[in-house]
Amino acid sequence: MDAGWKFDNSYARLPERFFSKVLPTPVRAPKLAVLNRSLAVKLGLNEEALRSEDGVAVFGGNQIPGGAEPLAQAYAGHQFGYFTMLGDGRAVLLGEHVTPSGERVDIQLKGSGRTPYSRGGDGRAALGPMLREYIVSEAMHALGIPTTRSLAVVTTGETIMRETELPGAVLTRVASSHLRVGTFQYAAQWGTIEELRALADYALWRHFPGFEEAENRYLFLLEQVIERQAELIAKWQLVGFVHGVMNTDNMTISGETIDYGPCAFMDTYSLETVFSSIDTEGRYAYGNQPYIGGWNLARFAESLLPLLDENEEKAIALAQGALDEYPKRYHHHWLSGMRAKLGLAEEQEGDQELIADLLRLMEAHRADYTNTFRALTLGEYTGMALFDSAEFREWQERWQTRLSQESVSREEAYERMRRHNPAVIPRNHRVEEALAAAVHDGDYSVMERFLEALSDPYAYSPEQEKYAELPPPSDRPYRTFCGT
C-alpha cells in the first residue's frame, strides 16, 4: 500500500558542508502512539498506509521511504548568549515531501539515533517530551500561530536514560524548512563566501518568492526574516506563550515556531514569567522575548554582511537600517493584536495607554492572562480579585467609552474579541495530566479529549469550560525541562 510520499530533496543539493548523510538508527518495536489525521490529509498521505506496519516502520526509522535521502543538518548557534557548533544531534531529515498542492515540507524524525553532531548524546528522545511537542505545536497551529507540526509519535519499545529510565519515542516533525539563524551563523563562521551565498539563495528560493525583483536580494532576505519574526513574536506575546529556549538555532528563517522543549503558557500575567529550569537568569522570560528576537536577528544580519555589500561600512549601514525596523514592526503587530483583543478595529491615540493600564492592573492583581481577556469577551466578571477592584471598574468605563467610538456595532466588536481571545490554551497542568495518563498508564484518551478542545480555541463551547479552569494553588512554581 502506497502512503503517498513524494520526495524531492533540494537541501541535499546544497554544498556538503551543510549536512552529513546518515541513516536513522532502527528501534526495537515501533508502535504508533498518535497520528495527526488532519495533517496527513493536508499532506496528501494515505492514513491507512501510515498506520500499517510499513508506515509505522518509517516513523520509527526502521524503513526508509522511496525517494528519501536521510541526512543530519549542520548549524551553529548562540545558546544563552554563547556561540557554539551544533547540528542535528538526535534528528534525521528524511527529505522534502511535495504535497498535491505543490507545497514543499521537511519530514524529520526526532529521536532517531546518533549523528555526527551528537556530541556524546545518545540521539534518542523520551515519550513525554515528544508528546508535549505534539500537543503544544498543534495548539499553536489552531491558535493561528506559524509553527512546525507533528505528524506522528511512535514508541520504540526501548528505554532511555535521563534522570531516570524513560520510555523512548520518535516524533515525525513537519516544517516549511529547518533553516535557522544558526545555519547562517555556521556558514559565515566555517564556510566560504560562495557557500554562504548558496545558502542565502536557497533560502530566498524556498521561502521568499519575488526576490528576483529586489534591488539587493540579500537585504530583501534580511528584511523578510525580520518582518516574519516580528509578527511571530508578537503573536506569542498576545497569547502568553513562553518559548523558553530562544537560542539562535531555534529561530527559523521561515518564521515558524520551532523546538517546544521547555515551553509553557503563562497563567498569572507577569513580564518576568520563566518556566525553563535552565533559564536561571531569566534571559528568555516572557517580557524579554521581543528583545531577544531583535538580538537574534542582529546575529543573522552579521552573518549576511559579506553578501550585503563588498564595502563593509556600507554592509553594516544596510544591516543596521533593516534592524532598526524590527522594534517598529514588532510594536505594530503587537499593538494591532492588542486592539483586536479589546474589540478595537480603529486606531486612536489613547489606545496604548488603555492597554498598558489594563496590563498593569493584571500584574498588580496577579490576574490570569487568558481568562482576563476571556471575561472581557464574555462580559462575565467573576472569580478574580482584579474584577472587584475600583481601579478595574474605572478602567472598564474608559474601555466601554472607547468601544462606543468605533464605527462598528458593539456586537461586531465582541465578535472581533472572540476571534482574538482564545477560550482555551494548553494550560500547563492540563498538559501534565495528559502526559501522565499517556506515559505512565498508556491511556491516550485524556490527551485526545484535550487535543479536541484545543483544536478550535475560539469556539467558546461548553466542552472547553473545564480546560479554562486555573491550576490548583501551589507553593512551587511550574518548571519545564528541555528533554534532551
Swiss-Prot record:
Residues that coordinate or bind ATP: 87, 89-90, 110, 122-123, 173, 180, 259
Active site per UniProt: 249
Reactions catalysed: L-seryl-[protein] + ATP = 3-O-(5'-adenylyl)-L-seryl-[protein] + diphosphate; L-threonyl-[protein] + ATP = 3-O-(5'-adenylyl)-L-threonyl-[protein] + diphosphate; L-tyrosyl-[protein] + ATP = O-(5'-adenylyl)-L-tyrosyl-[protein] + diphosphate; L-histidyl-[protein] + UTP = N(tele)-(5'-uridylyl)-L-histidyl-[protein] + diphosphate
ATP-binding found in the keyword field: yes
Described purpose of this protein according to its UniProt entry: Nucleotidyltransferase involved in the post-translational modification of proteins. It can catalyze the addition of adenosine monophosphate (AMP) or uridine monophosphate (UMP) to a protein, resulting in modifications known as AMPylation and UMPylation.
UniProt cross-references to HAMAP family, sorted A to Z: YdiU_SelO
NCBIfam families: PRK00029.1
PANTHER family xrefs: PROTEIN ADENYLYLTRANSFERASE SELO, MITOCHONDRIAL (PTHR32057:SF14)
Protein name according to UniProt: Protein nucleotidyltransferase YdiU
Originating organism: Geobacillus kaustophilus (strain HTA426)
Top-level taxonomy: Bacteria, Bacillati, Bacillota, Bacilli, Bacillales
Underlying gene: ydiU
